[in-house]
Amino acid sequence: MNGAAVIQPAPIPFYTVLVLYLGIMAFIGWYAGRKTNNIGDFFVLSGKAGVVVSGIAYFSTQFSMGTFLGTPGTIYGVGYAGMAISVPGAVFCMILPALLIGRKLITLGHKYGFLTMADYLTDRYHSKKMSGVLGVMMLFFLVPMMGAQIIGAGVIVHVFTGLPEWVGVVGMGIIVILYCMTGGMKGAMMTDVIQGSLMIATAVVTFIVSIVMGGGFSNINHTLQSMNEAYLTFPGANGYMPWTYYISNIVLWSFFTMGQPHLFTKFFAMKDHKTMFKAILLGTAGMFFSATLIEWAGVNGIASIQNIEKADQIIPMILQRGMNPFLASIFIAGIVAAGMSTIDGILVTTTGAVTRDIYQKIINKNATDEAVMSLSKVVTVIIGIVVICFGVFQPGSIFEINLFAFSGMAIFVVPILFGIYWKKATAKGAIASVIVGIISLLLFTLNPSVKALAMGFHALFPTTIIASIVMIVVSKFTKTPPQETIDRHFTV
């Protein structure tokens, strides 16, 4: 069966459901905008987010088009071993950040009014240069991350309507820009609750449909074995998942989430420590459950659908071929939700990097909060347009782009952890660690000779070690922040 034969457009049901869904999201953004009274509301909900909002918003922002399209698409060519890409890491991706940095961030955020990652790093290291470094890095890496999500919208529109992918890219981009521009973090987190719930439902339904299409577990496994026995064993087809890469993925999608600004900021939005720990239980359950089922569906799809145009299409095609068009469209909205919930969180965070961390702290130190809020809406539109352009040109697969962007921001784990646990960490040490870390990451990723030195582990492993050494060495020979700053961060 060829790819063109697999795609069976059903545009009317798809448009009906999607327009209704996007209309609801737009209304929530408008409503949230009416309730957004100050800059604290816009960026972190004034630190009032409860258990349900915090837990679901964290996991729905962490999970993305990559989880629902890119990762299953990668697994589609690997088999069961591919599920190790993110399922094990999902267990720890809220627990580790909460235990290592969450409690302290909530306390500091409420006490000193921190709204962004740059607020924390700038204050901890007593250096406004940190704002500039973080702001530039966020623009460089988070725009591609948003672009990966919006590419997924194009894939979905193409599968369900037969229209070019750019139509879905532009449509989704406009809706997200509108509700983030008007509602900020309040709009983002309110929509995240709906989107996260829909994502869980989509994972469950897709998994069930994939089993039915494949004729049950036994038949699916028999088919996989007849196609390629490697689908059933480690390291998977083409040796994709050796033990070094397996360990890398567990650490990558759990420990290194601490360096993601859009997730880091979620701690400032939480009401208190009790809320955080309850939110961890809720969010972790949602992540593990959703990741397991949607990725397993990708494996099941190998047995029932072959020769598709793009591997990223496997989940939409399972829903399209296995369900009534209207029902399929409802659950495909869950995949759209996965992308939107990630984009909105990142877009608000990136806007904050430009308006607060670069403009208010470096360019115009006298700018009022009202001026920053007005500028934020303009910046949201500009960044959104850049993301749409990125999505239209599609420089790589959803999974590849996501992994690149995530890895780049993960370098900030070094200044964050040293800032929280080592009093002698300095601003110059932090900045040097990030710069050297980014250069090392690019070398370990792009240069085959250097990449071989990682011995099969992800580039972030040696990169983090190098960045940590740079942090320690440079800090030893540079001036520490004032004692007042140290006391403010280590006596809370």
Mark where each language-model region is:
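Membrane-embedded helix-loop-helix hairpins and adjacent transmembrane boundary segments
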Residues: 1-492
